[in-house]
């Protein structure tokens, strides 16, 4: 099955009360694990790729070809979108689209509102002409992801969210509502009131960044308010690192990378399967 945009899968998720996971790629093993877990659960999936991860893997084109090769060799038949996470500029979004990405996020949330609208509109025009879906962000998601650092959380303004959607024609919106990138210090406090208002006023599928560490009860509360995409990366990274440490600590003579990267891949796969079930994505592939 060819790569698809995430527009249709998120519309279906919003209409049918579940969420699609975006699981970030960091290397070959992450990609194998996420694709295999999703295929086994018969779940649509979004492969997130940050600019930093793309650089680590040599570039957007390499990432796309790796994903396409794995989909062929692993006989992947579920819908798969490949999505630029936190695109920093129009130029980066264009570069990803030209390399074969089927979805992009333009993160101009640090810019003044009118500038955010202007940049996002430019990305939407280029992307939609090529059948590529677009996500935008308002407010500030705290924590750190690659080169994107935010000291605190700035909640999205519901009126600005509605205006951004109307002026740009984006497909999905990531309003900052209390989640953070990376591990949480204490329990997250999500703005459900704002989430409900934004979901109702925009009519769009909403995105929850920083999905690691958010309690299941909060996930289940967020989905009926319009949250249709939940991003996960840190949890998979922690599971992977733990598996590698375990192998190396138990056997000081191990040097073959397959002996420790294999268990890391299995740990990621099990983590992703757990998230798929938690988000209600199992058996939703169409």
UniProtKB/Swiss-Prot annotation:
Record-level Gene Ontology MF annotations: fructose-bisphosphate aldolase activity; zinc ion binding
Protein name: Fructose-bisphosphate aldolase
Taxonomic placement: Bacteria, Bacillati, Bacillota, Bacilli, Bacillales
E.C. designation(s): 4.1.2.13
Cofactor(s) named in the record: Zn(2+)
GO terms under biological process: fructose 1,6-bisphosphate metabolic process; glycolytic process
Transmembrane segments: none
Record organism: Staphylococcus epidermidis (strain ATCC 35984 / DSM 28319 / BCRC 17069 / CCUG 31568 / BM 3577 / RP62A)
Domain of life: Bacteria
Cofactor stoichiometry and binding remark: Binds 2 Zn(2+) ions per subunit. One is catalytic and the other provides a structural contribution.
């Amino acid at each position: 099955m060819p790569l698809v945009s995430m527009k249709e899968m998120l519309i279906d998720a919003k209409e049918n009360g579940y969420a699609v996971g975006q699981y970030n790629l960091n290397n070959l093993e992450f990609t194998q694990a996420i694709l295999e877990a999703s295929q086994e659960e018969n779940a649509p999936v979004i492969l997130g790729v940050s600019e930093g991860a793309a650089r680590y893997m040599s570039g957007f084109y390499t990432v796309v070809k790796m994903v396409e090769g794995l989909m062929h060799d692993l006989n992947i038949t579920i819908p798969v979108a490949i999505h630029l996470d936190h695109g920093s500029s129009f130029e980066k979004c264009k570069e990803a689209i030209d390399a074969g990405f089927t979805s992009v996020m333009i993160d101009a949330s640090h810019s003044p509102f009118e500038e955010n609208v202007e940049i996002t509109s430019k990305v939407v025009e280029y992307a939609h002409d090529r059948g590529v879906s677009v996500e935008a962000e308002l407010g500030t998601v705290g924590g750190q992801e690659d080169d994107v650092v935010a000291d605190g959380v700035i909640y999205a303004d519901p009126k600005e969210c509605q205006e951004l959607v109307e002026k740009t024609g984006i497909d999905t919106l990531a309003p900052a509502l209390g989640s953070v990138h990376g591990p949480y210090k204490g329990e997250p406090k999500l703005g459900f009131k704002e989430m409900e208002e934004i979901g109702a006023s925009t009519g769009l599928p909403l995105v929850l960044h920083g999905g690691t560490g958010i309690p299941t009860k909060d996930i289940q509360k967020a989905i009926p308010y319009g949250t249709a995409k939940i991003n996960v990366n840190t949890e998979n990274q922690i599971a992977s690192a733990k598996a590698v440490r375990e192998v190396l600590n138990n056997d000081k003579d191990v040097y073959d990378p397959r002996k420790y990267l294999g268990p890391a891949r299995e740990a990621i796969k099990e983590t992703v399967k757990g998230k798929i079930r938690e988000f209600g994505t199992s058996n939703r592939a169409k």
